[in-house]
């Protein structure tokens, strides 16, 4: 949530900052601003409410702001309403200290009151202005430089932050600090960059540093020095980003979301190939030994949003194949309920960004109880990846659309791979079954590609027909219920249509009272053992007036006797059907949103990476 960029070098800063903020739009925002300084002059600050184009118009696409050092920000309101006044950057009255900030300062009211007693006044309702003036207070009181002032502020502040600060007395330099909020430092030839995520850096450099918690950085042109909170210089590893820069561009597609839907075959294939070697799944890079796998008594999967849905699917696969009890939890609940974690357990955290605040807190809670942790993440070097005991990297590449598609698909595959390998190591499946499952996994990329080729136009037509629906319900049983949850989320988050997913067996326990004439019900039935029971549930809603869309496996053509619109997925092992069943549901959500003329990639009120509670 929110986005920070920074630049110091020999080029004009403002156009680079604007371009960087554009690549962070997916994180969600309601206002934006820039601060740029030219040599020793005080920074010029320009802000705008609304979309980034308003800021671009104010600054003539950055050309009106002269200077080669600057910071920029897209704000998601947490303290103070969305307004130009509350937008970042924030500064002291004389602009001697200017800063942008992501995160939440929990004790900002207490600090604000003390600063008022010291003669400070405030023009905004934000916690960020409080941080700026606290830094200024320490800077002037102790007269010991920016690092000292920022370190003192860090010790005073409670909460989360990624801070980028410019001081009038230090031209062409930017100072940064971090606590539980993402910040990446890029280094090029004679220039340095700051960003909340990788995409803004890719056009300029692939050499980056990941700044850690309670650490500070000092950026010069092409040079960065890092310090701990005691202001002692520390060494950081320079990491090379392997992502393809073109992956963060639309590449001729109308939206990032449809591009990323079409990138799923490659993302799934790359993730499979990263661990399947010589006909076997190799988890040595994840650090999971066979002895650890054999000793497991329970697995906890903890995640948020779509990652949680991927975890629910993984639960079905792991329990059925490996016979290990699995509990799936929402991270926002897990972290606050004082969970009882058994010995010989494994806590698996799933997060695309590796920075999700609740998931990170859940990881730390598990570690504090001495339970081994594993991260399934898409971003190399992210906080969750760095802090987990074991790491399984998905290879989805940069995902820009707020509504996840390819990252979710790779999370599904990661869950399958763990389930299959755990079963193999523990001897709960035969060698023949292991080989069959591996073969089925490796067919998934081509099957997803075929689905995209065969069904896109039919689903586009159907989506246009139901673009004005008021309510849509998704139903399924077993692993199909996990797919139903993801399909419902995809629809509601980008089309703003009220949608819910229900376990089909629960319909008669209350939900069926919501079914009325013409309401759309999407039924997923890919499990042979549950097929007839699902048909019965579908007949129940149809006789109450529902319009039925059925999604099933090729060969189940008798479904057309019950449904009004049928979609078929290729045959695969039933443990892996979510990877195929979700694709038509992604397309449905996408085309409904397009038909309504909505902003598919940046739906209202949502952020790609939720880094605050």
Listing of model-derived features with the role each one plays in the protein:
Residues 1-250, 254, 263-297, 336, ...:
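Conserved short alpha-helical segments that host acidic/polar catalytic motifs at enzyme active sites
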Residues 7-10, 101, 121, 125, ...:
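Hydrophobic alpha-helical scaffolding
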Residues 127-130, 310, 314, 410-414, ...:
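Catalytic-loop motifs flanking and including active-site residues across diverse enzymes
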Residues 231, 547, 562, 572-613:
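Generic C-terminus detector
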């Amino acid at each position: 949530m929110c986005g920070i960029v920074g630049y110091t070098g020999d080029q004009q800063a403002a156009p680079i900052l604007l371009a960087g903020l554009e690549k962070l739009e997916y994180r969600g925002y309601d206002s934006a601003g820039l601060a740029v300084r030219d040599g020793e002059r005080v920074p010029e600050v320009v802000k705008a409410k609304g979309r980034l184009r308003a800021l671009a118009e104010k600054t003539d696409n950055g050309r009106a702001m002269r200077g080669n050092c600057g910071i920029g920000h897209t704000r998601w309101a947490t303290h103070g309403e969305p307004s130009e006044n509350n937008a970042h950057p924030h500064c002291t009255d004389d602009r001697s200290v200017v800063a942008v900030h992501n995160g939440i300062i929990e004790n900002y009211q207490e600090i604000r009151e003390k600063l008022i007693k010291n003669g400070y006044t405030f023009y905004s309702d934000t916690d960020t202005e409080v941080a700026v003036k606290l830094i200024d207070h320490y800077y002037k009181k102790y007269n010991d430089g920016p690092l000292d002032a920022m370190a003192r502020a860090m010790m005073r502040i409670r909460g989360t932050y990624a801070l980028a600060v410019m001081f009038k007395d230090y031209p062409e330099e930017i100072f940064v600090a971090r606590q539980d909020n993402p910040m990446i430092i890029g280094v090029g030839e004679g220039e340095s960059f700051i960003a909340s995520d990788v995409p803004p850096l890719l056009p300029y450099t692939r050499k980056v540093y990941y700044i850690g918690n309670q650490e500070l950085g000092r950026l010069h042109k092409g040079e960065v020095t890092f310090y701990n909170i005691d202001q002692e210089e520390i060494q950081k590893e320079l990491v090379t980003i392997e992502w393809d820069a073109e992956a963060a561009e639309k590449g001729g597609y109308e939206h990032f979301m449809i591009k990323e839907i079409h990138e799923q075959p490659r993302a799934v294939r790359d993730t499979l190939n990263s661990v399947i070697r010589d006909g076997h799944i190799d988890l040595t890079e994840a650090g999971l030994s066979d002895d650890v796998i054999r000793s497991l008594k329970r697995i906890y999967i903890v995640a948020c949003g779509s990652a949680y849905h991927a975890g629910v699917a993984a639960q079905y696969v792991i329990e059925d194949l490996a016979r290990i009890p699995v509990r799936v939890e929402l991270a926002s609940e897990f972290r606050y309920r004082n969970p009882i974690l058994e010995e010989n357990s494994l806590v698996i955290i799933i997060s695309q960004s590796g920075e999700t605040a609740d998931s990170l807190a859940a990881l730390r809670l598990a570690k504090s109880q001495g339970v081994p942790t594993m991260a399934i993440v898409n971003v190399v070097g992210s906080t969750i990846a760095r802090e987990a005991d074991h790491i399984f990297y998905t290879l989805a590449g940069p995902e820009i659309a707020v509504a996840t598609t390819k990252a979710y698909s790779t999370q599904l595959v990661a869950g399958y791979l763990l389930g299959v390998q755990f079963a193999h190591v523990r001897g709960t499946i035969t060698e023949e079954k292991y080989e069959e499952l591996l073969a089925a996994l490796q067919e998934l990329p081509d099957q997803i590609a075929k689905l995209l080729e065969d069904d896109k136009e039919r689903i586009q037509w159907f989506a246009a027909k139901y673009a004005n629906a008021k309510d849509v319900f998704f139903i399924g049983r077993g692993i199909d219920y996990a797919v139903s949850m993801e399909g419902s989320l995809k629809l509601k988050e980008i089309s703003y249509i009220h949608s819910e997913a229900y376990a089909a067996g629960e319909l008669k326990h209350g939900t069926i009272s919501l079914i009325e004439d013409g309401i759309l019900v999407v039924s997923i039935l890919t499990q042979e053992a549950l097929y007839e029971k699902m048909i019965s549930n579908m007949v129940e809603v149809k006789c109450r007036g529902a319009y039925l869309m059925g999604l099933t496996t090729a060969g189940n053509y008798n479904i057309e006797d019950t449904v009004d619109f049928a979609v078929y997925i290729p045959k695969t092992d039933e443990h892996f059907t979510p990877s195929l069943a979700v694709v038509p549901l992604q397309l449905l959500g996408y085309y409904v949103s397009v038909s309504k003329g909505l902003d598919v990639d940046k739906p209202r009120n949502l952020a790609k990476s939720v880094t605050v509670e």
